[in-house]
Regions:
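Conserved ATP/PPi-binding loop(s) of AMP-dependent carboxylate-activating enzymes
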Residues: 1-26, 61-63
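Short, low-order "capping/linker" segments at domain edges
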Residues: 142-148
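A short, polar/charged loop-to-alpha-helix boundary motif
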Residues: 155-158
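Short proline/glycine- and acidic-rich turn/helix-capping motifs at secondary-structure junctions
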Residues: 132-142
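AMP-binding/adenylate-forming catalytic core of the ANL superfamily
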Residues: 9, 14-15, 37-127, 144, ...
C-alpha cells in the first residue's frame, strides 16, 4: 500500500509566502508533505507511484496513472503515454489515454484496437482507458513536467 512521503531537514522551507492555507496543508511541525506516493521494495528502496493529486477513483477502486502508463509503454512504438481522468455525462470518472507514436505503421483505429486488447489482457478492466488520443507531443512545463490539466481540458473541448 503506497504512502505519502514527508520530509524534514534544515533546508526545508517553513511555508509558502503569503499563502497561509496552502502552507497549513503541507507544512506540519517542521515536516513537508511532498504529495508523492511511495512504497518500499524488499531491499528498502523507494518505489515511486505518482502524485497523490493524480490518483483516480475508478469504479470504486483507487488507480495510479503511472501503473497504466508503464503498461502502455511496453509497446515499443509508443514513446510517451499519459492517463487522465475525465468525467462523463453521469459525473463518473473515465480514463483517457494520450499517446505519442512517432512511427505509426498502421491505421490509428487498428493500433488503438490492438492496444486496448493488450491492456485488457494485462490490467484489470477498470484500469483500461475508454478512449485513446494520439498526440504529436505531450504538453510539458518549462522544466519538463507533464501538464495533465492541459490533457483534461483537451478532452473537455472535444
Amino acid at each position: 500500500m503506497p504512502g505519502v512521503l514527508w520530509v524534514k531537514m534544515d533546508s526545508v522551507a517553513s511555508g509558502y509566502w503569503n499563502m497561509e492555507e496552502a502552507t497549513n496543508e503541507v507544512f506540519k511541525d517542521g515536516w513537508y508533505c511532498t504529495n508523492d506516493m511511495f512504497t518500499f521494495d524488499a531491499y528498502g528502496h523507494f518505489e515511486y507511484h505518482g502524485r497523490i493529486d493524480d490518483i483516480l477513483k475508478i469504479s470504486g477502486q483507487w488507480v495510479s496513472p503511472i501503473e497504466i502508463e508503464e503498461e502502455v509503454l511496453k509497446n515499443k512504438l509508443i514513446s510517451e503515454a499519459a492517463i487522465v481522468g475525465v468525467p462523463n455525462q453521469d459525473g463518473l470518472i473515465r480514463l483517457a489515454l494520450f499517446i505519442v507514436v512517432p512511427e505509426l505503421t498502421e491505421s490509428k483505429e487498428t493500433f488503438e484496437k490492438e492496444l486496448i486488447g493488450s491492456l485488457k489482457t494485462n490490467l484489470s478492466i477498470y484500469k483500461c482507458p475508454r478512449k485513446i488520443y494520439f498526440l504529436e507531443e505531450m504538453p510539458l512545463t518549462a522544466t519538463g513536467k507533464l501538464q495533465r490539466f492541459v490533457l483534461r481540458d483537451l478532452v473537455k473541448s472535444l
